[in-house]
Amino acid sequence: LDYLVGTRGSIFSAEKTRPDFHEPTGFNIDVCREVRGALPTTPVFLQGSVVDWGQAEWALGDGVCDAVEMTRAQIADPDLVSKLSADAAHTIRPCIRCNQTCQVRDARSPVVTCVGEPTSGRETEDPDWYAHTARARNVLVVGGGIAGLEAARVAAVRGHRVRLVERTHQLGGIAALAGPGAPLVQWLIGGCTAAGVAVEMGTERVAPRPDDVVI
């Protein structure tokens, strides 16, 4: 026996095998502890909603397991491991466990991707979203929901001069009101700040005239 993976659920309770945000993260930690106690010499893998690298590090350090599976976390940010190695954990895009586009049990066999990282799963067919532009333009993004924040962030990372206007006094749109979506909203806001996006809230003013408008 090479190793054991502690899991829950079956074909009759598939929601327990890969649950969304309604279940706690790392919900199989207790299973791994029991397996470790019964088979102390067999390597144990922790699986089940481990999307926070800090929790994974704790589980390894506390002896809960020998390895951790973080599938959805690496769909949300395929560079998770390299960012940790580069001491850039603060730049890791969070998985909010929404299970919207990363489910594998679908007879239609769709691309496994992520609502928070739309390039994930399409690396071989999409152009490089982050290729630096040879000619910077003035870009106006109208709307500070998660789509607007991502558009503004990517445009700024590519070297454009970006201004984002939001009619309300809060960024993130509906996602900011839903508890599970808050970490992604905060990550996007931080990314826009780091990239130099000029954000204006409580306004519908679009002047001066930009070169490009994203609505």
Predicted regions located by residue number:
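Flavin-dependent oxidoreductase catalytic cores
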Residues: 1-142, 146, 150-162, 170
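Phosphate-binding active sites in nucleotide-utilizing proteins
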Residues: 137-215
